[in-house]
């Protein structure tokens, strides 16, 4: 097969591993910088160009779209879909999962466990909002934040009110969530491919830190999932419409709670923590599922 990997940097660990795995299985691979692409949108022969050259025909595309370029990246992916290229994850599913508030609302509708979450527009609603999530301590998150950036643990009600009002004053969209103390600064990343959780790791925050992101110095170890945790991860990925996803779960006294569903999960942490060749499993999944007509939405919506 001819496979395109949408990535800003061919030297990134995940991009490099996916390319190596695809080549090892006999496929032709091209890394495409989606920000350097531009599109010819017409009714007879839509195409994608890069640096003055029309891209060749691909059988499948693996989107590795960073959060900061979601709009343009998914536009390029939609163009691939309209041209009949099979996407590992569809543009609609990626867009859905990148909207943190919408994704929580969709998960809630499917009765999937979540931390109690509040969202408001006016500073006058802040006191009631804090009551909704059980008061302080609570977690305040920028909707546009990634890798733990824009996430604040407010340990007192006064601190929470000050942080929320400051964010609102900057016209930033935020949500407020209950703090799950019993998680102990740890979460579980479940790596979902198709209808299976193929790997899982526990990420532990540094002492004095509550954010367990590996980008923030957290450590990762292999972990055994309970049947309920496995089921929750699969249901969360399916609700987003994602074939490949990193589902982040907190262990709480109420059972597993989904924090986030990541449409472009990194491979380095999970492969090194578990020893599992995740990249190879992704390529195998593509081999089994590629059909020119298998994009459900055809780039619509």
UniProtKB/Swiss-Prot annotation:
Molecular-function annotations in GO: ATP binding; metal ion binding; ribosomal S6-glutamic acid ligase activity
CC per GO annotation: cytoplasm
Family matches, as SUPFAM superfamilies: Glutathione synthetase ATP-binding domain-like (SSF56059)
Residues where Mn(2+) 2 binds: 260, 262
Binding-site residues, Mn(2+) 1: 248, 260
Pfam families assigned: RimK, Rimk_N
Domain of life: Bacteria
Co-factor note (free text): Binds 2 magnesium or manganese ions per subunit.
Enzyme Commission number(s): 6.3.2.-
Keyword field: ATP-binding, Ligase, Magnesium, Manganese, Metal-binding, Nucleotide-binding, Protein biosynthesis
Disulphide connectivity of cysteines: none
Any one Gene Ontology BP term: protein modification process
Residues bound to Mg(2+) 1: 248, 260
Ranges for domain ATP-grasp: 104-287
Enzyme class: ligase
Record: residues binding Mg(2+) 2: 260, 262
Binding residues annotated for ATP, in chain numbering: 141, 178-179, 187, 211-213
Cofactor: Mg(2+); Mn(2+)
PANTHER family: RIBOSOMAL PROTEIN BS6--L-GLUTAMATE LIGASE, RIBOSOMAL PROTEIN S6 MODIFICATION PROTEIN
Family statement drawn from the similarity comment of this UniProt entry: Belongs to the RimK family.
Protein name per UniProt: Probable alpha-L-glutamate ligase 2
Gene: rimK2
């Amino acid at each position: 097969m001819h496979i395109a990997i949408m990535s800003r940097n061919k030297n990134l660990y995940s991009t490099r591993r996916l390319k190596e795995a695809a080549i090892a299985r006999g496929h032709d691979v091209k890394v495409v910088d989606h920000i350097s692409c531009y599109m010819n949108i017409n009714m007879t022969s839509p195409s994608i160009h890069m640096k003055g050259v029309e891209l060749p025909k691909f059988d499948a595309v693996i989107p590795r779209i960073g959060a900061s370029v979601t709009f343009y990246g998914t536009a390029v992916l939609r163009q691939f879909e309209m041209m009949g290229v099979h996407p590992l994850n569809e543009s609609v599913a990626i867009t859905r999962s990148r909207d943190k508030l919408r994704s929580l609302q969709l998960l809630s509708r499917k009765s999937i466990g979540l931390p109690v979450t509040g969202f408001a527009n006016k500073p006058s609603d802040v006191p009631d909002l804090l009551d909704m999530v059980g008061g302080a301590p609570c977690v305040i998150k920028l909707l546009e934040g990634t890798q733990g950036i824009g996430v604040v643990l407010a340990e007192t009600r006064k601190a929470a009110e000050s942080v929320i009002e400051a964010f609102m004053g900057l016209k930033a969209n935020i949500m407020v969530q209950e703090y799950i103390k019993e998680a102990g600064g740890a979460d579980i990343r479940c790596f979902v491919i198709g209808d299976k959780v193929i790997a899982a790791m526990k990420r532990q925050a540094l002492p004095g830190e509550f954010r367990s992101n590996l980008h923030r110095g957290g450590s990762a170890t292999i972990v055994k999932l309970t049947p309920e945790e496995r089921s929750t991860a699969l249901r969360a990925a399916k609700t987003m419409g994602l074939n490949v996803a990193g589902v982040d779960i907190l262990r709480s006294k109420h059972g597993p709670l989904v924090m986030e569903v990541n449409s472009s999960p990194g491979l380095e942490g999970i492969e090194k923590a578990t020893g599992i060749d995740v990249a190879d499993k992704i390529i195998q999944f593509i081999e089994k599922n590629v059909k020119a007509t298998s994009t459900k939405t055809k780039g619509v919506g």
